[in-house]
Amino acid sequence: MNLQVDHIRVDFIIGSRRISNFCWAFILLFGALGFFFVGFSSYLQKDLIPFLSAEQILFIPQGIVMCFYGIAGLFISFYLWCTICWNVGSGYNKFDKQKGIFSIFRWGFPGKNRRIFIQFLIKDIQSIRMEVQEGFLSRRVLYIKIKGQPDIPLSRIEEYFTLREMEDKAAELARFLKVSIEGI
């Protein structure tokens, strides 16, 4: 989602609260619980979950391994749920031509650096760079080139579904900032 007035443009960045993250967190949680309960059922020699039979599983070594996988999956699921709750990675890119400032704000993990806020001068922006790698793990990222700084990514890798969307976004931003586009 973008918000643009005459001299201010704000691009909102979606963080961890995406449907795919919710799906993976649920799948991981239920899968890990299934593994753990089957492993624990093999220890008790009693089915804790009616549709998951543990009669054929010996506690040593299969039951222990399943409990271990279940606990590991629960930790990973907990991590995913925490990133979703904290909305890590969300924020905005703000371009204020009146003040001449480009600001990046992102939410991070809790702690001293929870809020990430960086500012640059708009006059130092050289261009908008597009990086496109097609293939099995395609990658489409917009970068902003600033004098004396490494390229700064403006978008997530999976944000753009088509090359056309990415080109349109880059063209809008380049037009607003009156800079050139590099890449492709």
Curated annotation (Swiss-Prot):
The keyword Membrane applies. It is found in: Plastid, Chloroplast thylakoid membrane. GO terms for biological process: photosynthesis. Seems to be required for the assembly of the photosystem I complex. It holds the Pfam family Ycf4. Keywords: Chloroplast, Membrane, Photosynthesis, Plastid, Thylakoid, Transmembrane, Transmembrane helix. It comes from Marchantia polymorpha (Common liverwort). It is a multi-pass membrane protein. The lineage of its organism: Eukaryota, Viridiplantae, Streptophyta, Embryophyta, Marchantiophyta. The keyword Ion transport does not apply. It comes from the Eukaryota. GO terms for cellular component: chloroplast thylakoid membrane; photosystem I. This is Photosystem I assembly protein Ycf4. Belongs to the Ycf4 family. The chain crosses the membrane at residues 21-43, 58-80.
